[in-house]
Amino acid sequence: MNAPHTPHLNEAEAAAAVEANAAELGRRALTRREQKEAYENNKLFKRLVRQVGQAIGDYNMIEHGDKVMVCLSGGKDSYALLDILLRLRERAPIDFDIVAVNLDQKQPGFPEHVLPEYLTKIGVPFHIENQDTYSIVKRLVPEGKTTCSLCSRLRRGILYRVAGELGATKIALGHHRDDIVQTLLLNMFYGGKLKGMPPKLQSDDGKNIVIRPLAYAKETDLEKYAELREFPIIPCNLCGSQPNLKRAEMKALIRDWDKRFPGRVDNMFNALANVVPSHLMDARLFPFAGLRATGEADPNGDIAFDEDPCGTDASAPGGAKSVSIVQFDDL
């Protein structure tokens, strides 16, 4: 709405008129900087929603009638996961239910009121599972050693059980792109295997389907989103355990690469969805022993003496041909 033309007003009076007009509209006029921030924040929101929606569609993570159990730790990632899934559900062409679950492991200083108050406020069904795994871990793990591995195994088993009790058909975890690449590097550097963190898999007990809807999202975007949404973050080091130093090293490495070599981490992530078994060395994935020359050209055959061209624009996971069962209106 344009203000009426008043040629006799000086600059101060004109500014006052603009402020008064904004007040009449019930809000203060935004500065140019505020307008830019609002624009960037809106882009961030749309990007995250688009990435989560695409991941869900590419891997058929959520289907009609599903009951999705969102594992909520109180960290930025799980808050963002719940928030975005709730927004997507409003526009989804399918019906599915969401229940938030938190495992209270009785860590010293854990603010047990935070999550129930937050979830009640936003109107999301939730379940708090109280299990003193902290005492078990402290009893079994020597002082000074990281407790993360044992704690994770105990937590996983409990959450699988809770999913069955609640009738959940999918278990949603808050792992993102950076977590997936970190896991790939950890397995390569310390485990001697090409293994990442899949966006969808069957649990080791064979009874649950685990999904990671944030698989395409960058951690830096999730950090910014958590700040904008002002989630009541709960610290992740209440147990006093030493952090996983190897994973912290991979995280620092990825952050450094993202700054110094734009696109490198994206290409590493995309490589997980563009695997060529015939050009690796795993005989379980490709029948090297029985390979014979057929006399027919093979586009996937070895180019032998030529240098393999390195692409810098590897297509994203899912590719252009993927068909999403969940499509959302423009936001």
From Swiss-Prot:
Per UniProt, the keywords (alphabetical) are: 4Fe-4S, ATP-binding, Cytoplasm, Iron, Iron-sulfur, Magnesium, Metal-binding, Nucleotide-binding, RNA-binding, Transferase, tRNA processing, tRNA-binding
The UniProt entry, under SUPFAM superfamilies, shows: Adenine nucleotide alpha hydrolases-like
Q: Which residues bind [4Fe-4S] cluster?
A: C148, C151, C239
Q: Name one GO cellular component term.
A: cytoplasm
How many cofactors are bound and how? Binds 1 [4Fe-4S] cluster per subunit. The cluster is chelated by three Cys residues, the fourth Fe has a free coordination site that may bind a sulfur atom transferred from the persulfide of IscS.
Essential cofactor(s): Mg(2+); [4Fe-4S] cluster
The record's annotation in InterPro entries points to:
Rossmann-like_a/b/a_fold (IPR014729), TilS/TtcA_N (IPR011063), tRNA_Cyd_32_2_STrfase (IPR012089)
Compartments in which it is found: Cytoplasm
Q: Which family is it part of?
A: Belongs to the TtcA family.
> What function does this protein fulfil?
Catalyzes the ATP-dependent 2-thiolation of cytidine in position 32 of tRNA, to form 2-thiocytidine (s(2)C32). The sulfur atoms are provided by the cysteine/cysteine desulfurase (IscS) system.
PANTHER family of this UniProt entry?
AMINOTRAN_5 DOMAIN-CONTAINING PROTEIN, SULFURTRANSFERASE-RELATED
> Any other comment in the entry?
The thiolation reaction likely consists of two steps: a first activation step by ATP to form an adenylated intermediate of the target base of tRNA, and a second nucleophilic substitution step of the sulfur (S) atom supplied by the hydrosulfide attached to the Fe-S cluster.
Identify this protein by name: tRNA-cytidine(32) 2-sulfurtransferase
> What's the source species for this entry?
Burkholderia mallei (strain ATCC 23344)
Task: Name the gene that codes for it.
Answer: ttcA
